[in-house]
Amino acid sequence: MPKIGMEPLRRRELIDAAIRTIGQRGSLDVTVAQIAHEAGVSPALAHHYFGGKDKLILATMRHLLRELGRDLNAAIKQANTPHERIAAIIAVNFSATQFAQETIAAWLTFYVHAQQSDDIKRLLRIYARRLHSNLVFALEQLTSRARANRIAEGAGAMIDGLYIRHALGADAPDAASAIALVEDYIAIQLSGQPSAEN
């Protein structure tokens, strides 16, 4: 039996190991035994805490979303203006925690497997909606709501695209360059230049 009080630590170790294992393999075609080995625990203990691979994978995704949400909330609390809020949202998405190679690979793997998993698809939609709504909240203080929605859609697509480029490796922008690209895009859109509809 696991030691009393060790469950939170062991669960976190297994989730971290799942991120590494999925990231290294670039696939969800991993076993609980492989993840447990990476975490340095027995497969039986992993099954005890999560009840199987699917639940461990979903717990890993939820952990990444919680971590992103926690970091974002902390950053937004320090923002005093809409521009600072936008900068905080962008910076958190490219922070050292989020823009790490194995985390990026895990996220992209989740996107691929969302085509077969309704649970994964639902969690990815939650992420996309949160990013969009956070951006729109700040942007609509600077422009119309319709334009704020359009800019937020573009910024979200850029963030996803930069993650893909970083995963591919070739000529991938670093975090600072990625932040600058998204900030430049938003600044240009807010500058009053005509949109494609005009």
UniProtKB/Swiss-Prot annotation:
Repressor involved in the biosynthesis of the osmoprotectant glycine betaine. It represses transcription of the choline transporter BetT and the genes of BetAB involved in the synthesis of glycine betaine. This is HTH-type transcriptional regulator BetI. Residues 31-50 bind DNA. Residues 8-68 form the HTH tetR-type domain. GO terms for molecular function: DNA-binding transcription factor activity; transcription cis-regulatory region binding. The lineage of its organism: Bacteria, Pseudomonadati, Pseudomonadota, Alphaproteobacteria, Hyphomicrobiales. Keywords: DNA-binding, Repressor, Transcription, Transcription regulation. Pathway: Amine and polyamine biosynthesis; betaine biosynthesis via choline pathway [regulation]. It comes from Brucella melitensis biotype 2 (strain ATCC 23457). Pfam families: TetR_C_6 (PF13977), TetR_N (PF00440). The keyword Transcription regulation applies.
